[in-house]
Amino acid sequence: MLWVMGSSARNPYVIATRALDGDAEHGGLLFRINCAGCHGIAGQGLVGPSLRGVSSRLSDPQIIHQVVSGETPPMPRFDVEPQEMADLLAHLKSFTADT
């Protein structure tokens, strides 16, 4: 995966990801394997911040950038194909502020 500097909304990876239909169920599996250790199984936050309501705080391009960039340690860079990122994004959108 190549992350191109500049506006994340114009990034080819972001464009490819957003063009896909995400599978929230598969995204949940990816989340449990890769993210829940720090963000909690329900996105409530542990070592990492709460992800409840994240899609109301950040745009899709911002969320994608946050996940794949590795620019905010201690969160590692998550190197996934656009379909997997679309799936994860669909799952993250299920975390409403009151879940």
State the predicted function of each range.
Residues 1-3:
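Non-ligating segments of multi-cofactor redox enzymes
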Residues 12, 25-29, 49-54, 64:
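Short linear motifs at secondary-structure transitions and domain/linker junctions
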Residues 42, 46, 52-99:
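Extracytoplasmic electron-transfer domains, predominantly the class I c-type cytochrome c fold
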